Amino acid sequence: MRIAIATCSLLPEGHDYDRPLLPALERAGADVALEVWDDPDVAWHDYDRVVVRWPWDYTHKRDAFVEWAESVGDRLHNRPAVLRWNSEKSYLADLSAAGLPVVDTTLVQPGDPVPELHGEVVVKPTVSAGARDTGRFSPAVHHEARALIERLTGAGRTAMVQPYLPAVEARGETAIVMFAGRESHVLRKRAVLAPDEQAPPADHELGSAQVMWDPELVRAGEANDAERELAARVIGHVAERFGETPLYARVDMLTDGGGRPVLLELEAVEPALYLATTPGAAERLAAAILSPPT
């Protein structure tokens, strides 16, 4: 079976976090090639399956990325419809409307007035990755939060405002990685944003915040039953919505003030899966790719 792994021109060999996937696929008998997603010379129809892994520049050109996904069609995983929906964080409103516990999120579109802010908040754009253009603001610097919202919406982008949940300081984020609807491994990510920190500095061509490249940021972790139940509900909703279980997904969650898990993000476009943190994770993803969900 011929498998194309879609990456970007800035990561032509992929990224260390998830590179173990390539030899795992080869050991399983696949013919694997890394291809740059927006290279016009790639014949995507020559591949049996195309798997999105490292197109980490897509947030700069989302429309082109979605068009590319739709042109590749049904050989693509995750599916084009999932990529279109999940590549803008307004999908959180859909999940909340479906009754899933989601971190309270206010969307501010271009032309909307800046909403009243309460307590410590996080501001970020709906199309972004790697903590880019993101800030954490206490009430003392709400004027800076409003300025970031206005900068984003003034540039034609939609901003989102969420409360900062202090439980992240003690426990971090829990991320459950799912392959074909089954749990593969659990990650623990420490807090990224320092108090009153706006748009952390980037030191990488992809524009991700400096802290996102810290090798100590994410480690193998454990999930409790409530977190596992939430991850299963989220993936179940996506499967029902699109008629197919996503091949891969990372379900990021925090603990709210009442001690229950709430969804922070569902990463189903190009999440870092941190395959190297957990023995067998790369092999599980390879098996899912070679026998994708239906």
Residue ranges of predicted features:
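Active-site nucleotide/adenylate-binding loops and adjacent lid/helix of ATP-dependent enzymes
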Residues: 1-7, 69-73, 81-174, 179, ...
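Conserved N-proximal alpha/beta basic substrate-recognition cap immediately N-terminal to
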Residues: 9-109
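Short secondary-structure junctions
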Residues: 30, 100-101, 118, 240-247
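A short beta-turn/loop motif at secondary-structure boundaries
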Residues: 41-43, 165-169, 254-257
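A short beta-strand motif that forms the metal-chelation/ATP-contact edge
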Residues: 47-51, 124, 174-178, 255, ...
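Glycine-rich phosphate/pyrophosphate-binding beta-alpha loops
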Residues: 56, 131, 192-195, 267-277
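Phosphate-binding site of ATP-dependent enzymes
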Residues: 139-241, 262
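ATP-dependent carboxylate activation and anion-phosphoryl transfer catalytic cores
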Residues: 223-294
